[in-house]
């Protein structure tokens, strides 16, 4: 609707990888329908890209569609990967606060840690996956979702078995490659949802 109304010369569309496998009630691939509609007026290319290949300390994989209006007679070029090797991706330790800078409110309680351990054991016995994820500080972060405000278990910092914490708002901004002085509004929940729903700024910069 936006493209039909504004008719921009070009656009960049970002979405989760899951959209590639999403189907309608009648069994059609949603992405095929989208691409058919976009291709009426735009020359389009579609890619699956990692934000960590574009100077973002986060393994955030996304579908990127780039389109240029057909009357301009330009075919979009493939995005150029900035970080050529997995070994050169930015590790999350580069943007984390020092331990002494983190407020105690970010640390999990003894009860919460015990709950994680119990759930981990039950999941292991069932042969199922386990929800809580501990960051490997030498690698990019896991994807930060909008739901991170609920418990923060998608990406936890583990110093020891008894010292485990959630990421701070500042660290979440950095993981999405936003500058420290970037202003967020609303409650803590609102701010985390804004971060989780955003396109990582360095990712967008290189694509644009």
Describe these PLM feature segments.
Residues 1-137:
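Class I S-adenosyl-L-methionine
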